[in-house]
From Swiss-Prot:
Binding positions for Fe(3+) per the UniProt entry: H68, H70, H238, D313
Protein name: Imidazolonepropionase
UniProt organism field: Paracoccus denitrificans (strain Pd 1222)
Catalyzed reactions: 4-imidazolone-5-propanoate + H2O = N-formimidoyl-L-glutamate
Pathway: Amino-acid degradation; L-histidine degradation into L-glutamate; N-formimidoyl-L-glutamate from L-histidine: step 3/3
Function: Catalyzes the hydrolytic cleavage of the carbon-nitrogen bond in imidazolone-5-propanoate to yield N-formimidoyl-L-glutamate. It is the third step in the universal histidine degradation pathway.
Length: 400
C-alpha cells in the first residue's frame, strides 16, 4: 500500500467540473488501483501506516492516453512532405499511388523485428511525456498477413514497455493495387476474413475504417461494422476529414466508440454522436500538417454535449507527430479548446474513446496510472510549447 502526498491532484472527475483540483492532496494505491483520494488532512486512519512518497507539491494528473495512432509502419514519407509543399494535395498524392500506398510497400517488405525497432523510439517519445495508454492501428499492410504482422508488433510494444496498448483492425484504410478493380473482393477476402482471423488470434480490440471519397463508402463501412458486431468487436471510424459523407452518423448508429477527424462534420452527425455517446476524436496534427482550413465544429459539439478527445494521429504521411503535449497546444491554438478541455481530451475522454472505464480519472477504483509533473498549474501542460515537465510516470501503481 502506497500513500502519495504533498501533491496537487488533478482528478479530471466529470462531476467536479474543470480540472477537479485537490490542493494539498493525497491518494492511496492498493493492488495497482486508487483506493482513496482527497485532501491530506482528511486521510483516514486506516492508511496511516502506508508507505509514503512525498511529491513535493508537484502536480499529479491521470496518465495521458493517446487514443488514435498509426505508430507501427515501415519507411517514411519525407518526400511526400516536400510534394505537398510544392502544391500537391492529399487526394492527388493518394490517387497517383503515393500516400498510404507508399507506406504499404515499405510495411509489407519489413519483418516484425524491423517494424518493432522502428516503432519503439516513437513510443518511447510518447511515454517520456506521461503517456500510459496507447492505441495502435494496423492499416499499412492491406493484406491479411501484413495487417496481422502489424498487430503482433503492437502487442509486443505493450509487452516490452510499461504502457497499455489497445489494438485496432484498420484493413479498411485504402484499396491495395491488387484489388483496385475489386472493392467487394477486398472487403470480403481481406477486411472481413482478416478480421475473423485476427479476432480468433486475440489480436484485435476494435475495428476502424476510413470513410472518404478516396477510401471506403458509408455503405461499405456499415457492412464491415455489421460483421464486427457479430464478432463482438467495438467500432470506430475516420470520418468527415475531407468531406461530409455521413460516416460519423452511420458510425454512431452502430454504437461506435469514436468518430475521428471530423473537420466536415454536419449537424446530423453531431446529433447522432450525442445520442450514442460516441466520442469526437480531434486530430490537430493532421489538420496542421495538411494545412487545412476547414475547422471541426467545436461550438456545435460543445452545445450538443459530445465528449471531445485529442490524439496525435501519429503516422508517416499526414501527422508525423509523437508529442501529446504539443497536440494539446494545437487543440487550444487551432481549435479554440480550453486547457481543461485539452487535458480531458487526453485523459477522461480518450479513455472513453477506447472503451476503457478504469482510467482517465483520479477517483477510487481507477487503475493507478498517473503522471507527476514539475509544474504548479495544469494549464501549463497546454500552454507551454516544446517543454516537457514530466517528473515521473506511475503505471498500475508502479513507478517507472
Amino acid at each position: 500500500m502506497q500513500l502519495l502526498h504533498h501533491a496537487q491532484l488533478v482528478t479530471m472527475d466529470e462531476e467536479s467540473g474543470g480540472y477537479g483540483l485537490i490542493e494539498q492532496g493525497a491518494l492511496v494505491i492498493e493492488a495497482g488501483r486508487i483506493s482513496w483520494i482527497g485532501p491530506e488532512t482528511d486521510l483516514p486512519a486506516q492508511y496511516a501506516d502506508a508507505t509514503r512518497r512525498d511529491l513535493g507539491g508537484r502536480l499529479v494528473t491521470p496518465g495521458l492516453i493517446d487514443c488514435h495512432t498509426h505508430i507501427v509502419f515501415g519507411g517514411d514519407r519525407a518526400r511526400e512532405f516536400e510534394m505537398r509543399l510544392e502544391g500537391a494535395s492529399y487526394e492527388e498524392i493518394a490517387r497517383a499511388g503515393g500516400g498510404i500506398l507508399s507506406s504499404v510497400r515499405a510495411t509489407r517488405e519489413a519483418d516484425e523485428e524491423a517494424l518493432l525497432a522502428a516503432a519503439l523510439p516513437r513510443v518511447d517519445t510518447l511515454l517520456a511525456e506521461g503517456v500510459t495508454t496507447l492505441e495502435i492501428k494496423s492499416g499499412y499492410g492491406l493484406d491479411i498477413d501484413s495487417e496481422l504482422k502489424m498487430l503482433r508488433v503492437a502487442r509486443r510494444v505493450g509487452q516490452l514497455r510499461k504502457v497499455t496498448v489497445r489494438t485496432t483492425w484498420l484493413a479498411a484504410h485504402a484499396l491495395p493495387p491488387e484489388y483496385k478493380d475489386d472493392r467487394a473482393g477486398y472487403i470480403r477476402e481481406v477486411v472481413i476474413a482478416g478480421m475473423e482471423r485476427g479476432h480468433a488470434e486475440g489480436l484485435i480490440d476494435a475495428v476502424d475504417g476510413f470513410c472518404e471519397g478516396i477510401a471506403f463508402t458509408r455503405e461499405e463501412m456499415a457492412g464491415i461494422f455489421d460483421h464486427a458486431a457479430k464478432l463482438g468487436l467495438p467500432v470506430k471510424l475516420h470520418a468527415e476529414q475531407l468531406s461530409d459523407l455521413g460516416g460519423a452518423a452511420m458510425a454512431a448508429r452502430h454504437g461506435a466508440l469514436s468518430a475521428d477527424h471530423l473537420e466536415y462534420l454536419g449537424q446530423d452527425g453531431i446529433e447522432a454522436m450525442a445520442a450514442s455517446g460516441t466520442v469526437a476524436v480531434l486530430l490537430p496534427g493532421a489538420f496542421y500538417t495538411l494545412r487545412e482550413t476547414q475547422y471541426p465544429p467545436m461550438a456545435a459539439l460543445r452545445d450538443a454535449g459530445v465528449p471531445i478527445a485529442l490524439a496525435t494521429d501519429c503516422n508517416p504521411g499526414t501527422s508525423p507527430l509523437t508529442s501529446l503535449l504539443l497536440t494539446m497546444n494545437m487543440g487550444a491554438t487551432l481549435f479554440r479548446m480550453t486547457p481543461s478541455e485539452c487535458l480531458a481530451g487526453v485523459t477522461r475522454h480518450a479513455a472513453r474513446a477506447l472503451g476503457l472505464k478504469d482510467r482517465g480519472r483520479l477517483t477510487p477504483g481507477m487503475r493507478a496510472d498517473l503522471a507527476v509533473w514539475d509544474i504548479r498549474h495544469p494549464a501549463e501542460l497546454t500552454y507551454r510549447i516544446g517543454f516537457n515537465p514530466l517528473h515521473a510516470r506511475i503505471v498500475g501503481g508502479e513507478l517507472v
